[in-house]
From Swiss-Prot:
It comes from Dictyostelium discoideum (Social amoeba). It is found in: Membrane. It is a multi-pass membrane protein. Residues 15-39 have a biased composition (Low complexity). GO terms for molecular function: ABC-type transporter activity; ATP binding; ATP hydrolysis activity; ATPase-coupled transmembrane transporter activity. ATP binds at residues 874-881. This is ABC transporter G family member 17. Keywords: ATP-binding, Coiled coil, Membrane, Nucleotide-binding, Repeat, Transmembrane, Transmembrane helix, Transport. Residues 507-751, 1182-1405 form the ABC transmembrane type-2 domain. SMART domains: AAA (SM00382). The chain crosses the membrane at residues 517-537, 547-567, 592-612, 623-643, 764-784, 1182-1202, 1219-1239, 1260-1280, 1298-1318, 1322-1342, 1450-1470. Belongs to the ABC transporter superfamily. ABCG family. PDR (TC 3.A.1.205) subfamily. The keyword GTP-binding does not apply. Residues 151-402, 838-1082 form the ABC transporter domain.
Length: 1476
């Protein structure tokens, strides 16, 4: 009974407290419509359109019905919802939104629509993760250590050899939330908030174990997996296709989530249109419908607008339970509140259960929720009504600062540096997370909530909401969707929608399409020119095969870009899979459907050019079979390469696997090595190679039915006396398939004798190619359905060996708290700043848009002085980041006008180096640890005369002050892989990297974005101490609490269009600031109100904010503006400057040091960058060990393919092809090096913007760091290939072969880097790469001998090809010592006339030809001709190569390497600045 009374009192207290917690907030929005400016994410001219659309949607659906709301008239005289508590009155847009949802719900009930009312109950939930001490940074030594453990017999007797240390991410959590209610999850980063939301959303794959019960209504978690998509987890990252527009993004989701039981006579299209217009109006995206979403690399929506798209997409998905994880990141305070209100309205009207974690939630947002749970290091320290949470902790002995919001107070309890203990409670309040959890579990409130949870579960068992829920889920499915399907739409509908989206993505990427088709045109004409009009003679037999080989390989290589495309789309695919939008297999099918038309076009374009230029037979059936076969090659190759991406976790793993398979495809193609020469151990790959079947098919297609003349080349011959061999019956064509006495060779005979190709199997071979395609499709469908290589945003930390901290250990927690406290107390002693006075006047910025200039900043002026902290505010899209970019000299596009001065002088070349810029995007090199990143910044940006020991000591101080001491040896990693530090920790690292440079001025762009309230408070407090130490700062901030806002001295407030609303002092308790707005007719700001929210509301910020005042114009007419103008003029005088910069200018020996662009000289830069790159490469096992494995494996494959070559003439041809294929290693390295270069180039652009190091230091370091890895790769390839193939093993030949091959590999790698430096992105470089590769391979003299080339190619392109000199050196070295001894199979057999012997008959012939003739029998006149007598015969007669040119050729390759180094330097210099 006592518990029942307590429970009842909780409910009453909850409602009353909701009504009284923030009494002074009632009037916060009373004047929402008083003022108007342009500070929104859309034009104010569209407000009337938005209202009209709302009105149209509402009227059409409601039919002027009366709005119904539950009002508690007894206890609340203010007519506010009981469940909402005391909160701001709804404005007009909120009212219309609520009205729309209520009326649509009412009409749906008329058609038997069942509500999906599903609450959530969590009992004894414990989530276990892997301990950090098990997670050691992987490097190149890791495989060897693992192999050592495997080979160590003693390891097999250890009892705990497989033991994994674990820790509890969540510990014994109990909570519940009813349907239609909202639960707020609060906690610092690392508290387990995201894990709790993921587990509620039934995403459990990332954890070792999940114990306890989570029930959805009366459905257990194990059964809830059938309803994937009914619980949604929306993370803080915005993951979208950047090239799709807002309309395309949302319409795609609507297509797949349109319910089957719509209102009568409402079509799918009408439903989608209404919902789309409602949501874009609701989130202020009406005018952005045709704007690309964009990302950090593609221009599109602003950060705030992109966040709204993420929110809108999740809302469209129609889940009954939605988990929002910090979804307000990047939104200003007004927009965040508007978003939270929309959640409240949908929870009320649609019975949605909403569970959300918020960073920096205001009281206005807090009061929208029903319950709150507070977590600390995975332990629940409070769960219950929002109205009782604050009092609970006050009763424990904690105190709350004035104007501090309740959410900030609650999460501040978990931070020893933040919380305040009441007088008299010292030593009595709980200290650690364990203490706080114990206090909670011993409280009466805990028992009451436990009782309330039991009552809720009983109610659920009685009402059985699952019955209506399951019925409605079935009703929402389309008619063609299986009842057992997790999806709302059928597989067919999914495929159609995905195909339309894929078409938009493919067709929208005009740049890549243009690059691809340009490559096809260029190379097709080059191929046609090289193999132009092949003669119908035996001289054209081999080159015809070369032309076919080239076309097949070309169409195969063209599709290799699909690997990168499949990898880049993974995260979007997995997000949509969790939303239950579509099956991954439907996504893959859509890619295939779009592949077909584009591949048809590219194949027919290529075929139309080359087929007729090759001089192939002019027959329509043969032409179309040629095209059809190449279509099969392209389709099967595209699916194969996508398969490598779908079956592997990373780019470099997929690339290595693709290269490995590609080696087999080329070697066992049937061209460079005929089937009869293949060894049994690898010959089976010939039969599973689709390219081999394509080669056979096209060879049959071309050769069948043709006769090839050998009139001029039949042996024996005498070019000086034609009558010598006038008897044609004793002559024969010198090719396989020939018959003595016939001066032509049938194509069918040649195919069988030379290549073992049955000319009757053309159709069969084509069918096999397409069967391979279907097989690859099946493999991919399996992979995309059952493999998920993304982390889903969950991050797992890895550390240097032995450096991992103890997790959730009480003693370790106390130690960390002491370290942070000590560092904070000593901060002033640690920080010694040398600030400057920075001013700007009449700053305007325009960018070219669609042929006109768009003004983004308009006449901005202001200053920052030493010791002052200036806030830069405005709604999303007002131009805050743009202004910071301009002030920090980061803009490389557009036109900037106006004047910026540092200490009264024009900005010097060192400005970017001596200023710190904390950018909004957290860009860090993932291969470094936190400490290494900070030390790198300190070493290269602090002054060179500062001792290294002092720089490192300062780094340690910053680590302590930023609360990152325990993360110093943690790998930064990436969010995509899930290995590394979290989003919040990356933000702190971004700030730390700038602080360790000891800048004179600090620009900070959203330093608290993505941080919790306590971390934000710590950051701002830390920045305040920097200002107090003499550093001038300007900081953009979106959602400052009143406590944070009080740390600033001045504010620059911007309106939409980059116009100034106010610049000046904030004043004590913000009186100076608020009085300015009050003088212009805005209501007074109350004592309990957040001034930051007040000014945003006054200026019409937020999604639907309005104002009647033209604030930019009001500013220009104010006395404050004139004061700013006068002050700027005053700051130019020496007298005024002397007040601020007495010690700020650097002096050396009494003289002012000249400004330096970089702090250190070139040699120091090169050494430090090279050392950093070595660390990164050493830790990138997939890249380095992958390249080693690839070199060894490809070498073994080639070596055993050409195993133990003898001295026959056919084996000489095999030696040539073996040397030709030695270039393959270079090609494989290109495909590995290009992605790595682009990755490092992106980090270089970020570093060079802050003047860490120069472009030539980066270029030369990138070249140098690759050299040892390339040398080792080449050596492994040489060892695996050289002796297995039976090449001359003399020391000189060995050394030359290794040296030449290594030098060529080094050159190829630097050439790949030059290509990467020249191209804007990797897609362009991949598109351009085939031109380079085919130039190297086709015009080197092997596939088509120089005499067979046209003069255009032979006279200059052939001689410019570095591969020509490489192969001349290798082949002449390999063939020079060989004495050719033909086998019986290699001999070309003919008979001498009666009365003569073989030697006599062939004597005139041998005087003009290479080789020798031997009698085959003592009793007959049968002779055998061996085409070569020595290895020199081939390269001297056919190629015109000279053994004496070996070292000349080596020198030429070195020269090519030098030219590629110059190319890298040149192109890096041209592209060093990012486009922004």
């Amino acid at each position: 009974m006592e518990e029942d009374k307590t429970f009842q009192s909780i409910r009453i207290s909850e409602n009353n407290n909701n009504n009284n917690n923030n009494n002074n907030n009632n009037n916060n929005n009373n004047n929402n419509n008083l003022n108007n400016n342009n500070d929104n994410d859309y034009d104010y001219d569209s407000i009337n359109n938005i209202e009209e659309k709302f009105e149209n949607v509402s009227k059409e659906l409601e039919g002027q019905s009366i709005k119904f709301r539950e009002i508690d008239g007894g206890k609340n005289n203010n007519n506010h919802d009981i469940e909402l508590g005391e909160r701001k009155p709804e404005n007009e847009e909120d009212f219309k939104l609520r009205q729309y949802f209520e009326d649509s719900q009412r009409q749906k009930m008329l058609i038997n629509h069942k509500p999906k009312k599903m609450g959530v109950s969590i009992k004894n939930l414990t989530v276990v993760g892997q301990g950090a001490d098990n997670s050691v940074i992987v490097d190149n030594s890791t495989p060897f250590k693992a192999l050592g453990k495997l080979l160590n017999p003693f390891n097999y007797f250890k009892k705990d050899k497989n033991k994994i240390n674990t820790f509890n991410i969540l510990n014994d959590i109990n909570a519940f939330i009813e349907d239609g209610k909202m639960l707020l999850v609060l906690g610092r980063p690392g508290a387990g908030c995201s894990t709790l939301l993921r587990v509620i959303a039934n995403q459990r794959e990332s954890y070792i174990s999940v114990d306890g019960d989570v029930t959805y209504g009366n459905i257990a978690a194990s059964d809830w997996s059938k309803y994937r998509g009914e619980t949604l987890y929306t993370g803080e990252e915005d993951i979208h296709h950047p090239t799709l527009t807002v309309r395309e993004t949302l319409d795609f989701t609507l297509k797949l989530k349109t319910p089957g039981n719509r209102l009568p006579e409402e079509s799918k299209r009408n439903f989608r249109t209404k919902i789309y217009e409602l949501l874009v109006s609701m989130y202020g995206l009406v005018n952005q419908g045709d704007t690309m979403v964009g990302n950090e690399f593609v221009r599109g929506l602003s950060g705030g607008e992109r966040k709204r798209i993420t929110i809108t997409e999740a809302m469209v998905s129609g889940s009954s339970i939605t988990c929002w994880d910090c979804s307000t990141r990047g939104l200003d305070a007004a927009s965040a509140y508007d978003y939270a209100k929309s959640l409240r309205i949908m929870s009320d009207t649609l019975d949605k259960t909403t569970i959300a974690s918020f960073y920096q939630a205001s009281d206005s947002i807090y009061n929208l929720f029903d319950k709150v749970i507070v977590l600390d290091k995975g332990r629940c320290i409070y769960f219950g009504p929002i109205g009782l949470a604050k009092q609970y902790f006050l009763d424990l002995g904690f105190d709350c600062e004035p104007r501090k919001s309740t959410p900030d107070f609650l999460t501040g309890i978990t931070n020893p540096q933040e919380r305040i203990v009441k007088v008299g409670f010292e030593g009595r309040v709980p200290e650690t997370s364990v203490d706080l959890e114990d206090a909670w579990k011993k409280s009466q409130l805990f028992q009451s909530m436990k009782h309330a949870q039991l009552e809720y579960e009983k109610q659920v068992e009685q009402q059985k909401p699952s019955v209506d829920f399951k019925e409605q889920v079935l009703n929402e499915k389309s008619r063609t969707t299986s009842k057992n399907s997790e999806y709302s739409s059928s597989f067919y509908a999914q495929t159609i929608a995905l195909t339309q989206r894929q078409l938009s993505l493919t067709w929208g990427d005009k740049f890549t399409l243009t690059s691809r088709f340009l490559t096809i045109l260029v190379l097709s004409f080059i191929f046609g020119g090289i193999y132009f009009q092949q003669p119908l003679t035996t001289d054209g037999l081999f080159t015809r095969g070369g032309a076919i080989f080239t076309s097949i390989i070309f169409n195969c290589i063209l599709t290799q870009g699909e690997l990168h495309g499949a990898l880049s789309g993974r995260r979007i695919l997995q997000k949509h899979k969790s939303y239950a939008l579509y099956r991954p297999s439907a996504y893959f099918v859509s890619q295939i459907l779009i592949d077909i038309p584009f591949i048809l076009v590219q194949v027919f374009l290529h075929s139309f050019i080359v087929y007729f230029m090759y001089g192939f037979e002019y027959r329509a059936d043969k032409f179309f079979i040629f095209c059809f076969t190449l279509v099969g090659v392209s389709l099967s190759s595209a699916s194969l390469f996508r398969g490598f991406a779908n079956f592997t976790p990373s780019l470099f793993t997929a690339q290595n696997l693709m290269n490995f398979v590609f080696i087999f495809e080329v070697n066992y193609f049937g061209y460079s090595q005929t089937p009869d020469k293949m060894h049994s151990w690898f010959k089976w790959t010939y039969y599973i190679n689709p390219l081999a079947y394509a080669f056979k098919s096209l060879m049959i297609n071309e050769f069948k039915g043709l006769d090839f003349s050998c009139l001029d080349s039949a042996i024996p011959f005498d070019h000086f006396n034609n009558s010598t061999y006038s008897d044609m019956s004793h002559r024969i064509c010198a090719v396989p398939g020939s018959i003595e006495g016939s001066l032509s060779v049938k194509g069918e005979n040649y195919l069988w004798d030379a290549l073992q190709i049955n000319s009757d199997h053309r159709a069969l071979n084509v069918v096999v190619i397409f069967l391979f395609w279907l097989f690859y499709i099946g493999l991919n469908l399996f992979a995309v359905e059952y493999f998920d290589w993304t982390s889903g945003g969950y991050t797992h930390k890895v550390y240097k060996r032995g450096k991992a901290p103890k997790l959730n250990d009480v003693e370790e927690e106390r130690n960390q708290n002491q370290i942070v406290k000590k560092a904070t107390d000593n901060m002033k002693d640690t920080l010694k700043m040398r600030g400057g006075l920075f001013s700007w006047k009449s700053i305007s910025y325009t960018v070219p848009v669609a042929g006109t200039n768009k003004l983004l900043l308009d006449d901005i002026m202001g200053w920052i002085k030493p010791g002052q902290m200036t806030a830069l505010m405005g709604s999303s899209g007002a131009g805050k980041t743009t202004l910071l970019d301009v002030l920090a000299k980061r803009k490389t596009m557009g036109t900037v006008t106006g004047e910026s001065l540092l200490n009264g002088k024009q900005l010097e070349i060192d400005f970017e180096r001596i200023t710190g810029y904390v950018e909004q995007m957290d860009v860090h090199n993932p291969g470094l640890t936190v400490r290494e990143a900070l030390r790198f910044s300190a070493k290269l940006r602090q002054e060179p005369w500062v001792p290294l020991k002092d720089k490192y000591q300062y780094v340690e101080h910053v680590l302590e002050m930023m609360e990152m001491k325990h993360l110093g040896d943690a790998l930064i990693g990436t969010l995509e892989t899930g290995v590394g530090i979290s989003v919040e920790e990356r933000k702190r690292l971004t700030i730390g990297v700038e602080l360790v440079a000891k800048p004179q001025i600090l620009f900070l762009d959203e330093p608290t974005s993505g941080l919790d309230a306590q971390s934000s408070y710590n950051i701002i407090k830390f920045i305040r101490k920097l200002a107090d130490a003499g550093m001038p700062l300007v900081c953009t901030i979106h959602q400052p609490s009143s406590v944070l806002f009080e740390h600033f001295d001045r504010i620059l407030l911007l309106a939409r269009g980059g116009k100034t609303v106010y610049f000046g002092d904030i004043g004590d308790k913000s009186k100076t600031l608020t009085s300015y707005f009050e003088r212009h007719g805005v209501r007074p700001c109350t004592e309990s109100e957040n001034p930051a929210e007040y000014i945003l509301e006054a200026t019409g910020a937020g999604i639907h904010g309005k104002t009647d005042v033209n604030w930019p114009e009001a500013w220009k007419q104010s006395s404050e503006y004139q004061n700013v103008v006068n002050e700027l003029d005053l700051l130019r005088t020496k007298e005024e400057l002397g007040k601020y910069i007495l010690d700020s200018d650097l002096q050396v020996d009494g003289k002012q040091a000249p400004p330096r662009e970089f702090a250190n000289g070139f040699l120091t830069q090169f050494i430090e960058v090279y050392k950093r790159l070595n660390i990164i490469y050493y830790r990138d096992v997939f890249y380095t060990m992958g390249s080693f494995a690839q070199s060894a494996v490809s070498g073994l494959v080639i070596g055993f393919t050409f195993y133990d070559l003898k001295n026959s003439s056919s084996d000489q041809q095999q030696r040539i092809f073996m040397s030709w294929e030695a270039m393959i290693l270079g090609v494989l390295l290109i495909y590995l090096v290009l992605p790595m270069f682009f990755i490092q180039k992106e980090y270089f652009k970020r570093d060079t913007a802050s003047k860490y190091y120069s472009w030539h230091a980066f270029s030369l370091s990138m070249i140098a760091v690759e050299i040892p890895y390339v040398v080792l790769s080449s050596t492994l390839f040489f060892i695996a290939t050289y002796w297995t193939s039976g090449i001359d093993s003399t020391a000189s030949a060995n050394f030359y072969y290794w040296l030449m091959h290594t030098m060529f590999s080094v050159y190829i790698v630097s050439f790949a880097q030059a290509l990467g430096a020249a191209c804007v992105n990797i897609a362009i470089s991949i598109a351009a790469l085939p031109i380079v590769l085919f130039y190297l391979f086709l015009l080197c003299g092997v596939q088509i001998p120089p005499p067979a080339m046209s003069s255009f190619y032979q006279d200059w392109l052939y001689h410019l090809n570095p591969a020509k000199y490489f192969l001349e050196g290798l082949i002449t070295t390999v063939l020079k010592p060989i004495e050719v001894l033909c086998t019986d199979v290699d001999l070309i057999k003919f008979t001498a006339p009666s009365g003569t012997d073989c030697q006599t008959y062939s004597a005139p012939f041998l005087q003009q030809a290479t080789g020798y003739v031997v009698p085959l029998s003592n009793t007959t006149n049968e002779c055998g001709y061996c085409i070569y007598s020595s290895g020199s015969d081939y390269f001297e007669t056919s190629l015109g190569w000279d053994y004496g040119h070996r070292w000349r050729n080596f020198g030429i390759i070195v020269a090519y390497w030098g030219s590629s180094i110059l190319a890298v330097l040149f192109f890096v210099y041209l592209t060093q600045k990012p486009r922004r």
